[in-house]
From Swiss-Prot:
The apolipoprotein APOC2 acts as a coactivator of LPL activity. Ca(2+) binding promotes protein stability and formation of the active homodimer. Interaction with GPIHBP1 protects LPL against inactivation by ANGPTL4. InterPro entries: AB_hydrolase_fold, Lipase, Lipase_LIPH, Lipase_N, Lipo_Lipase, PLAT/LH2_dom, PLAT/LH2_dom_sf, TAG_lipase. This is Lipoprotein lipase. It is found in: Cell membrane; Secreted; Secreted, Extracellular space, Extracellular matrix. It holds the Pfam family PLAT.
Amino acid sequence: MESKALLLLALAVWLQSLTASRGGVAAADQRRDFIDIESKFALRTPEDTAEDTCHLIPGVAESVATCHFNHSSKTFMVIHGWTVTGMYESWVPKLVAALYKREPDSNVIVVDWLSRAQQHYPVSAGYTKLVGQDVARFINWMEEEFNYPLDNVHLLGYSLGAHAAGIAGSLTNKKVNRITGLDPAGPNFEYAEAPSRLSPDDADFVDVLHTFTRGSPGRSIGIQKPVGHVDIYPNGGTFQPGCNIGEAIRVIAERGLGDVDQLVKCSHERSIHLFIDSLLNEENPSKAYRCSSKEAFEKGLCLSCRKNRCNNLGYEINKVRAKRSSKMYLKTRSQMPYKVFHYQVKIHFSGTESETHTNQAFEISLYGTVAESENIPFTLPEVSTNKTYSFLIYTEVDIGELLMLKLKWKSDSYFSWSDWWSSPGFAIQKIRVKAGETQKKVIFCSREKVSHLQKGKAPAVFVKCHDKSLNKKSG
């Protein structure tokens, strides 16, 4: 009897060891399946947003528990771009911190492909395919191993990282929820086919910020063509406020040459800071407007919110999936918070004598129930008698309900005999203003029956004579 019990005990121990060894072999096999993945996946914490202290290792389930991955929350995967130094840029911990501030229970993973990103640009651009494959295999493993829903996954890629995110999204077993492209790189990608770059098919929703598209297609730092469901071009997508040459000279004079590299990529990196702004200032999202071109936007012709023609920039964007990519525009401030308030102004210039002037400088001042914004400069390429002109202006402060405006026609910076002999002028009865953010239209009337606007003279004053509030479905 005793020998039988010992035999059963020995059999149990043998079976247990066999099961354990098989489990170990299976785990080892799974690790080998991912041994060629070079990218690293660091789960950063709200307490330490700057350091990669814990890595999620594909094929090693214990690493997910060790890093305290939250299986019931959203996951953000931040993918950096090309690097000269081989180190993370200063924006990475800022974005991580902003994501955790907005979504405290989320997982923020930083994808480290620094060794590949530090090569000559064409080489690093080619590596985006391998990085995308690495990210896709990691995501697929998380879904298969832990049944983690891909509807909780949001990829954020900057520059080359945006295309790596797109390639990853195209290779996952199921579509991830969202990809945000932060000024996707232009060189090597402007004319690339969709499978080799970020495209609308790579996620349930793809939104893109274009902030440095200056130059000919294929040569601009950021990609020019739309590559998402919604493509937003702040300030036309070329240069960003505060990133101009004059600003560069001023900063170099104040801080020395150490910040030159920051100024070179200032507009490119602005895409990241605009997104960070949307995370931190959720109560006041910047509004972008769909438009056929930046020239039409500059004329104020696109401040409509009908049929999804306007949208929020950044995290709280409305996920509109149109058949064609939607190009949207907005103005911003030069620093955070970036939000401004857009207005379309329409003026009819009347007169008894035919006059035409080119490149005329004006100033307009707006006065509202909350604040005022004075001496806003604008230039009209042409001003002719008995013609109506539309243009865009914006204020950096919310002035509330519009009550009054002043319009001044500025003198030329050079001496003009014709202006000295007889000051040019136009008659203006009404000025129409539409506020983009509130969608309200206001008509301003001259304090007299007609205001006579003369070049270089006192501004003409107009007060609200009629307004018409419009809801979001109106024009």
